[in-house]
């Protein structure tokens, strides 16, 4: 089977990690990168050395010329266009484009990639109008005619699988979520101007900073049964990677904590294996650096007040786990499109056979 050819727009944290995931896979191929702010030699350096995930050791990486990188013997074309519609994705064969700049997050802006020859665009951020998919939760609802989709946020990818299991088994009346979230590139190293979010302008390296997040509300978009039942907030903390969700919910059906643990463990070993994890170990955040699962339930960290009121805790590598899901979503989209193409081809063959038979 032919590899899925992927391009990346924006070579920041998520762009580079998505590239690492693609380059370590057997069924996907990175064919192009666009970033107007980085030269190929600096791009090589940024990709090779990563303070969190370590040095790249899988292929030799070098600059062939100012428009080509070599990963081993595999060439990757580099563009430097600011306007998405000017990026010639079609020349490289990139059918799927990961939009990871954080700028072009609505459908109209992301659709500009289609003008350059891309067939599908995956936004690596929440979107106000593009359909959102969380692998393990609602990716089966993807239809091949959808050309612009969102992979939601890293926090929604952690929360949604957990919320789905709890709602399916016990029912959620309402709930509040807090994510204790590692710092990201949008924060300040020292106190600086941040007109829209004054607290967000304070130094990330030695403050716990309350912040807003739409991650809990977004769960209602991927799980309509929970629409309006969840909301939440964030605390940004001075760690460089790995975050943790605290979900406190009121249940429809009474349940013991042991029953809740058993339900989550069952799903983590069944339909959601590889997406939802389960641990009873005495873990801390650094134990999950490089974990490619979306959500790892911490059985020892949760508590019950009574049979209807429970606090659940789940960890996630907000960088690597999320980047892994971006590629998984592309795989699913490709398989869905391929199945449709096969059905269409079979229909054409059947019609052709009927026509030939009637002519005879």
UniProtKB/Swiss-Prot annotation:
Keywords: Glycolysis, NAD, Oxidoreductase. This is Glyceraldehyde-3-phosphate dehydrogenase. PROSITE patterns: GAPDH. It catalyses: D-glyceraldehyde 3-phosphate + phosphate + NAD(+) = (2R)-3-phospho-glyceroyl phosphate + NADH + H(+). The active site is at residue 154. D-glyceraldehyde 3-phosphate binds at residues 153-155, 184, 213-214, 236. GO terms for cellular component: cytosol. Gene3D superfamilies: Dihydrodipicolinate Reductase, domain 2, NAD(P)-binding Rossmann-like Domain. The record marks 181 as: Activates thiol group during catalysis. Key enzyme in glycolysis that catalyzes the first step of the pathway by converting D-glyceraldehyde 3-phosphate (G3P) into 3-phospho-D-glyceroyl phosphate. Essential for the maintenance of cellular ATP levels and carbohydrate metabolism. The keyword NAD applies. The lineage of its organism: Eukaryota, Viridiplantae, Streptophyta, Embryophyta, Tracheophyta. NAD(+) binds at residues 13-14, 35, 82, 318. One of its GO terms (biological process) is glucose metabolic process. Its EC number is 1.2.1.12. It comes from the Eukaryota. Belongs to the glyceraldehyde-3-phosphate dehydrogenase family. One of its GO terms (molecular function) is glyceraldehyde-3-phosphate dehydrogenase (NAD+) (phosphorylating) activity. Pathway: Carbohydrate degradation; glycolysis; pyruvate from D-glyceraldehyde 3-phosphate: step 1/5. InterPro entries: GlycerAld/Erythrose_P_DH (IPR020831), GlycerAld_3-P_DH_AS (IPR020830), GlycerAld_3-P_DH_cat (IPR020829), GlycerAld_3-P_DH_NAD(P)-bd (IPR020828), Glyceraldehyde-3-P_DH_1 (IPR006424), NAD(P)-bd_dom_sf (IPR036291). Homotetramer.
């Amino acid at each position: 089977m032919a590899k899925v050819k992927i391009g990346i727009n924006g070579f920041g944290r998520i762009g580079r990690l998505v590239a690492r995931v693609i380059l370590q896979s057997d069924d996907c191929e990175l064919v192009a990168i666009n970033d107007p702010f980085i030269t190929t030699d600096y791009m090589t350096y940024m990709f090779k050395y990563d303070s969190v995930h370590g040095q790249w050791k899988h292929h030799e990486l070098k600059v062939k010329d100012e428009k080509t990188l070599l990963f081993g013997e595999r060439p990757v074309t580099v563009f430097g266009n600011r306007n998405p519609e000017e990026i010639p994705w079609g020349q490289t064969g990139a059918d799927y484009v990961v939009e990871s700049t954080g700028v072009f997050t609505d459908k109209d802006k992301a659709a500009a990639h289609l003008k350059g020859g891309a067939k599908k665009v995956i936004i690596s951020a929440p979107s106000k109008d593009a359909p959102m998919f969380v692998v393990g939760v609602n990716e089966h609802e993807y239809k091949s005619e959808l050309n612009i989709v969102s992979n939601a946020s890293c926090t929604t990818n952690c929360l949604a699988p957990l919320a789905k299991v709890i709602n399916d088994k016990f029912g959620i009346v309402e709930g509040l979520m807090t994510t204790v979230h590692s710092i990201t590139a949008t924060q300040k190293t020292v106190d600086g101007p941040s007109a829209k979010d004054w607290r967000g302008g304070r130094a990330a390296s030695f403050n716990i900073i309350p912040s807003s997040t739409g991650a809990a509300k977004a769960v209602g978009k991927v799980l309509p049964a929970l629409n309006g039942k969840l909301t939440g907030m964030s605390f940004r903390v001075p760690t460089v990677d790995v975050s943790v969700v605290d979900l406190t919910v009121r249940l429809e059906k009474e349940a013991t904590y042991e029953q809740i643990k058993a339900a989550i463990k069952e799903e983590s070993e069944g339909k959601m294996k590889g997406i939802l994890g389960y641990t009873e170990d005495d873990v801390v955040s650094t134990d999950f650096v490089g974990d490619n699962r979306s959500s790892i339930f911490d059985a020892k960290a949760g508590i019950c007040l009574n049979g209807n009121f429970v606090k659940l805790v789940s960890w996630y590598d907000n960088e690597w786990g999320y980047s892994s899901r971006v590629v998984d979503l592309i795989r699913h989209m490709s398989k869905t499109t391929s199945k449709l193409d096969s059905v269409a081809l079979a229909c054409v063959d059947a019609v052709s056979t009927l026509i030939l038979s009637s002519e005879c």
